[in-house]
């Protein structure tokens, strides 16, 4: 397994619309395993393939259990996802491994139902609510070249751009 480099905003790579996965082979399995290792090392709960430079419609989500630990066997590997149903509305404070250090409230569906494939190309259906529903929507957005900061109000977006410039200035002087 290998740690992969996470691509950061404002890289144009993050705006790529990912392509459907067609080969469910050992290479794909290795990519999923590397993505999981990278996500855990980066203290994230979700990671889309495009965030590590792979323009493929796949993502992983591994929510921590009540003890705060993310168990590998709980990791969802979601390939070629499609929304079947969505419902409700909620605000959730989101962050992103590609936009480190910035968190903001984003409006999301409260519940989602998706169809996807696992690493063995088996078709699955998943109903999710609350944090899992938010994470699924956030990661699927990545597959479509959309970041959570794109969903902010104009005022919050200006605040984000200002904070980003200040952070970049600070990093140049370190």
Curated annotation (Swiss-Prot):
Cofactor binding annotation: Binds 1 Fe(2+) ion.
Superkingdom classification of source: Bacteria
Residues noted as binding Fe cation in the record, renumbered to the chain: 96, 138, 142
Record key words, sorted: Hydrolase, Iron, Metal-binding, Protein biosynthesis
Keyword Metal-binding included in the entry's annotation: yes
EC number: 3.5.1.88
The keyword Metal-binding appears for this protein: yes
Reactions it catalyzes: N-terminal N-formyl-L-methionyl-[peptide] + H2O = N-terminal L-methionyl-[peptide] + formate
Required co-factors: Fe(2+)
Residues the record marks as active site: 139
GO biological process: co-translational protein modification; translation
Chain's role: Removes the formyl group from the N-terminal Met of newly synthesized proteins. Requires at least a dipeptide for an efficient rate of reaction. N-terminal L-methionine is a prerequisite for activity but the enzyme has broad specificity at other positions.
Entry-linked PANTHER family: PEPTIDE DEFORMYLASE
Similarity comment: Belongs to the polypeptide deformylase family.
HAMAP family, per the entry: Pep_deformylase
Protein name: Peptide deformylase
Organism: Helicobacter pylori (strain ATCC 700392 / 26695) (Campylobacter pylori)
């Amino acid at each position: 397994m290998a740690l992969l480099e996470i691509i950061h905003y404002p890289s144009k790579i993050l705006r790529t619309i990912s392509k459907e996965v067609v080969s469910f082979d050992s290479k794909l399995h290795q990519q999923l395993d590397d993505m999981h290792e990278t996500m855990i090392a980066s203290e994230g709960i979700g990671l889309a393939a495009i965030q590590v430079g792979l323009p493929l419609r796949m993502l992983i989500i591994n929510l921590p259990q009540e003890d705060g630990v993310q168990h590998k066997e709980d990791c969802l590997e979601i390939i070629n996802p499609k929304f079947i149903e969505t419902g409700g509305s909620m605000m959730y404070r989101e962050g992103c491994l590609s936009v480190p250090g910035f968190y903001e409230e984003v409006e999301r569906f409260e519940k989602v139902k998706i169809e996807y494939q696992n690493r063995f190309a088996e078709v699955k259906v998943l109903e999710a609510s609350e944090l899992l529903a938010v994470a699924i929507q956030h990661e699927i957005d990545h597959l479509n070249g959309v970041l959570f900061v794109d969903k902010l109000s104009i005022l919050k977006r200006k605040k984000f751009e200002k904070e980003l410039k200040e952070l970049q200035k600070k990093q140049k002087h370190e």
